[in-house]
Amino acid sequence: MLPGQVLLTPAALMSTLPHQIRLIGGQWKRTRLGVPGVPGLRPTPDRVRETLFNWLGQDLAGWRALDAFAGTGALGLEAASRGAQSVLLVEQDARLAAALRQHQQRLSASAVQVLRGDGVAALHGQLAGSLDVVFLDPPFAAASLYAPALAAAAKALRPGGFVYLEADASWQGRPEAASFTLRRHLKAGAVHAHLFCKPLPTEEKP
């Protein structure tokens, strides 16, 4: 080490990053995590996240989750904090993926895995009916991802499973979500939050 050089622990290094998220429930409640300053990054607001997990339930014990455009990891880590059995965080950006791995290590989150790659491809790689919830929060500029992501999620989810989708106000993609039932909808500024459910066989339309 050079004279005057200070070596930061991973936790201290994360605290120097320009942005932070705060987990709001579960075993890591109130934990703050540093996030790299990446253009276009748009963490799900605390109020929206709190509403989402009120919809899903506070205890996700045994659930299997996939966060396809993880970004800050706020959605998937929140699920893990509330007891999800397994959470796969998928992120293409190298800096964000590295930060997610630091979060996983700092929290000793054994249920969390981080994959640097394409979220839609990761969904296609899941066994049919193997997931309980899929989080879809792609960049608003990437609206072309909604249709393939929803289609891939429909195959990966169990009947009765959930898809959470964040989109901007211009998204009018009801045909893209035709295989789901819209359970909840929330508007918060530019964010339109949708909670879809994959119908049970008895609920499917003829």
Indicate residue ranges for each PLM-predicted region:
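Class I S-adenosyl-L-methionine-dependent methyltransferase catalytic core
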Residues: 1-206
